[in-house]
């Protein structure tokens, strides 16, 4: 990876969400009329991508909240499930108007990468389909993306509110802050919650980042590549909710994969560990 570039800032006036999306706030009654299917000639403004692995307990709520956001924005959109489930998740998704794709490989990162190949929107949202993220926050994140002319917006759990039972104390007070610190030290990312799974970014940003990893380190890779390429990342505080359904992650294994990936790819790798020790 190359040396991180400096991200520039601008003071010029940016258009508001209503200027870019005139129908924003109208609340369309027939939201299904705004949903774009995979064969439609209509190009969606927004692609909402959710990786799913046996999420039948929460997928309906996630899709409904995403549809509420689409209705508020009043723009053509697609909801994409990148699904490897053995339960009723894909059937529920299709019934509610989502496009379901089945990745040909396993892995959190690969599920996203596979779906991104099929996503056609100008703006792309990614979020876990376990009810921990509120997809009705999409208009708020999109507003920040447009008004700040940023390339990516992260929903920050650590700057927002983490509801009781939604995140283990070890993750809240040690794991996530420490992993974020690593990224900020190595890549000057300047973020508070580098591993939030709720993000929105432009198509141009995705093409610049061009992620390659297949596992949980995918979340780190996106921030690393965005920083290296000088993309503007901004954050919006969000509420992190308790999940529906069984946990599918291995905390220690996935955390170590993040750390190892950051160390192996950090500028000045031989000096990475001493650098982190001095910075903490």
Question: Which residues make up each language-model segment?
Answer:
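Hydrophobic helical membrane-anchoring modules
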Residues: 1-43, 188, 211-280
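Short, well-formed alpha-helical segments that are part of the catalytic scaffolds
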Residues: 31-35, 55-70
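Cell-envelope/extracellular polymer assembly enzymes that use nucleotide-activated donors
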Residues: 45-47, 78, 221
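A conserved hydrophobic helix/loop-capping motif in glycosyltransferases and polysaccharide synthases
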Residues: 46-55, 62, 82
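Donor nucleotide-sugar binding loop of glycosyltransferases
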Residues: 55-58, 85, 108, 134
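A conserved acidic beta->alpha catalytic loop
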Residues: 81-90
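Acceptor/aglycone-binding surface of glycosyltransferases and processive sugar-polymer synthases
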Residues: 104-118, 123, 135-216, 242-261
């Amino acid at each position: 990876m190359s040396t991180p570039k400096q991200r520039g800032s601008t003071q010029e006036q940016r258009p508001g969400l209503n200027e870019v999306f005139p129908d924003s706030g109208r609340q369309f009654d027939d939201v299904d009329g705004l949903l774009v299917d995979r064969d439609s000639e209509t190009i969606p403004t927004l692609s909402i991508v959710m990786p799913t692995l046996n999420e039948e307990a929460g997928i309906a709520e996630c899709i409904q909240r995403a549809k509420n956001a689409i209705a508020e924005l009043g723009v053509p959109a697609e909801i994409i499930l990148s699904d490897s489930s053995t339960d009723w998740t894909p059937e529920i998704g299709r019934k509610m108007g989502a496009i379901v794709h089945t990745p040909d490989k396993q892995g959190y990162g690969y599920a996203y990468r596979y779906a991104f190949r099929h996503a056609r929107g100008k703006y792309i949202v990614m979020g876990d389909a376990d009810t921990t993220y509120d997809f009705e926050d999409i208009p708020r994140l999109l507003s920040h993306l447009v008004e700040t002319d940023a390339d990516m917006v992260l929903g920050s759990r650590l700057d927002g509110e983490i509801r009781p039972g939604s995140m283990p104390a070890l993750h809240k007070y040690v794991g996530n802050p420490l992993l974020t610190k690593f990224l900020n030290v190595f890549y000057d990312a300047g973020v508070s919650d580098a591993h939030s799974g709720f993000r929105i970014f432009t198509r141009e940003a995705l093409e610049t980042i061009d992620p390659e990893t297949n596992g949980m380190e995918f979340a780190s890779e996106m921030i690393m590549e965005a920083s290296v390429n000088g993309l503007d990342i901004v954050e919006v505080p969000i509420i992190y909710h308790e999940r529906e359904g069984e946990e599918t992650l291995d905390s220690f294994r996935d955390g170590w994969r993040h750390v190892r990936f950051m160390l192996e790819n950090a500028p000045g790798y031989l000096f990475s560990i001493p650098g982190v020790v001095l910075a903490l």
